């Protein structure tokens, strides 16, 4: 029987775990820290999970991460994120040549979140 890969969870570096958990909470994720003082936490929305790892040496200008979030309605997510007041760079939404409607959001830790839904 072939081995099945069942899920993936990116681990992104953050400078301050508590600040990152609050940011993801404001973006609509359920968040929690793992243990006390471990510098590790989770942000989950639906079946999507992003792991957060506090890293003292993290420099958003030199190290970063990219996650692609497949969603049912990228326009609705962009509108939601635009209204939540989270610090970062929110890009315009656009249709791509590869059949997605997507936008990008770079948070204060330098993580690029590309968010897209399939074009009809």
Language-model segments: what does each one mean?
Residues 1-19, 65-67, 118-120:
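N-terminal beta-strand motif that seeds the catalytic metal site of vicinal oxygen chelate
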Residues 36-39, 61, 96-101:
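Short acidic/glycine-enriched loop/turn segments that link adjacent beta-strands
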Residues 46-50, 57-59, 73-77:
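Short, charged/polar surface micro-motifs in flexible loops or helix N-caps
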Residues 11-13, 54, 97, 104, ...:
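Short beta->alpha transition motifs characteristic of CBS
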Residues 15-18, 67-112:
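Vicinal oxygen chelate
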Residues 11-49:
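Core segments of cupin and vicinal oxygen chelate
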Residues 42-48, 105-108, 118:
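Active-site beta-strand termini and strand-to-loop segments that position acidic
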């Amino acid at each position: 029987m072939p081995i099945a890969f069942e899920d993936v969870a990116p681990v992104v570096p953050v400078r301050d775990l508590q600040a990152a958990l609050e940011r993801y909470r404001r973006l609509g994720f359920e968040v929690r820290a793992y243990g006390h003082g471990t510098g590790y936490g989770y942000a989950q929305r639906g079946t999507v999970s992003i792991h957060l790892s506090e890293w003292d040496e993290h420099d958003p200008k030199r190290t970063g991460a990219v996650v692609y979030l497949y969603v049912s309605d990228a326009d609705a997510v962009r509108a939601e994120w635009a209204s939540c007041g989270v610090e970062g760079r929110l890009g315009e939404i656009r249709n791509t040549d590869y059949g997605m409607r997507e936008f990008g959001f770079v948070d204060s830790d330098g993580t690029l979140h590309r968010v897209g839904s399939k074009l009809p």
